[in-house]
């Protein structure tokens, strides 16, 4: 998967984010996408080929692998990153729509006094207020939901975050209970715990930013005259 397009889009969103949001984006790309692209694929590249079971029964190895690893860690992480990044794309769409409306009004001569030219509209930093505040805050809320949901899925699907060295399988067509051995279990456990820890950090950053936006919103309301 090519992550450069996603990085370009989210980089545009980063211009309109809070300081906490910029830290979140840095953590997302450096500690998650880069690790996933550069390191994790090397560790999980041999997962099915080196999944060995002590039986020659045709199909038994494939069935056992599918039973214990219904979805590859790499693919589930990639899916998680897509879901977590999608709400930020809503902010990018909102900003694009805002600028489009500003350009349309400028061309029609409705806001000639606010901007010198269209280039100034393109370079304008959009403040997180009004309808954009709701879009931005909603995107953070859904990011927290997606992060927590995927952490729960990881824990339930793989029966914890530690990779077992030995698993026992008695699924059909295995003739009896067979022993299957996982390749690089310790290394995979380290990567899994690291990715889960980074997910937890992202949740903490998102919750902090959400609280910051809510406090700023409430303080702004209280300053308005009754």
Swiss-Prot record:
Extracellular side: 41-73, 157-189
Residues exposed to the Cytoplasmic side: 14-20, 95-135, 211-226
UniProt-listed GO biological process terms: cell-cell signaling; gap junction assembly; gap junction-mediated intercellular transport; sensory perception of sound
Gene Ontology, cellular component aspect: connexin complex; plasma membrane
Binding site for Ca(2+): 42, 45, 47
Gene Ontology MF terms in the entry: calcium ion binding; gap junction channel activity; gap junction channel activity involved in cell communication by electrical coupling; identical protein binding
Annotated S-S bridges: 53-180, 60-174, 64-169
Chief location of this protein within or outside the cell: membrane
Subcellular localization(s) per the UniProt record: Cell membrane; Cell junction, Gap junction
Pfam annotation, one family: Connexin
Membrane-topology descriptor: Multi-pass membrane protein
Intramembrane residue ranges: 2-13
Keywords for this protein: Calcium, Cell junction, Cell membrane, Disulfide bond, Gap junction, Hearing, Membrane, Metal-binding, Transmembrane, Transmembrane helix
Family label: Belongs to the connexin family. Beta-type (group I) subfamily.
Protein function: Structural component of gap junctions. Gap junctions are dodecameric channels that connect the cytoplasm of adjoining cells. They are formed by the docking of two hexameric hemichannels, one from each cell membrane. Small molecules and ions diffuse from one cell to a neighboring cell via the central pore.
Record's subunit section: A hemichannel or connexon is composed of a hexamer of connexins. A functional gap junction is formed by the apposition of two hemichannels. Forms heteromeric channels with GJB4. Interacts with CNST.
Protein name: Gap junction beta-2 protein
Source organism per UniProt: Ovis aries
